Amino acid sequence: MGSVKSSNPALEGLHEELGVMEEQIRSIIESFIELGVSVYDFPGTPEASQGMVTNLKRNVDRIFKLNQTSNDPQSALKDVNVPLEVVQYIEDGRNPDIYTREFVEAIRRSNQYQRAKMHGMGMLRDSLAEKIKEQFPELKDDVENIVQRTNMKPTGQARVNSGTTNMTTTAEQSNVVNATAGDVGTNANTTESVEQNGI
């Protein structure tokens, strides 16, 4: 609980700066809308020209301030990277929250696929190990050694990790299972070849 509390101030500062940035961007958008209306209904009078120049300068100042805030090395926003796909969603008039939802769903599907693959390889390993021990008792120690080395159970720490880390761990486990399953197949083929040659 202590680590969570220590990270709260940074998160609160980030959310606060994001809120300020959101207000600045909203003000800039509203000002440009007002500027567009002024240009459309521009009467051509000196007063209207002065008001348009003032509005334009205000927009430039707001954009300049926004740029300064985004490039401030002391700002918590300096490490925030917006994916180009999100920008494209906004340009296309789509809700950027859809990108987040689709990304999370893609990670979840990939994680489930890797877990199912690991589980399937584990079942294949156990079944193959039992058959090899039945047919070739002299390989029992080697088979049990391989099964023990590839019997990687997720720890409690792995369960509380994020989906991306969990997916990476699962992929690594799957690779180990694939490699060791190949070892079992090689040992079985070697033994079968030896028996066929009468050695």
Curated annotation (Swiss-Prot):
Subcellular compartments: Nucleus
Keyword terms, alphabetized: Activator, Nucleus, Transcription, Transcription regulation
GO cellular component: core mediator complex; mediator complex
Listed GO MF terms: transcription coregulator activity
One GO term (biological process): RNA polymerase II preinitiation complex assembly
Pfam family, one: Med10
Quaternary structure, from the entry: Component of the Mediator complex.
PANTHER family, sorted: MEDIATOR OF RNA POLYMERASE II TRANSCRIPTION SUBUNIT 10 (PTHR13345:SF13)
Family: Belongs to the Mediator complex subunit 10 family.
Purpose of the protein: Component of the Mediator complex, a coactivator involved in the regulated transcription of nearly all RNA polymerase II-dependent genes. Mediator functions as a bridge to convey information from gene-specific regulatory proteins to the basal RNA polymerase II transcription machinery. Mediator is recruited to promoters by direct interactions with regulatory proteins and serves as a scaffold for the assembly of a functional preinitiation complex with RNA polymerase II and the general transcription factors.
Name of the protein in question: Mediator of RNA polymerase II transcription subunit 10
Organism: Candida glabrata (strain ATCC 2001 / BCRC 20586 / JCM 3761 / NBRC 0622 / NRRL Y-65 / CBS 138) (Yeast)
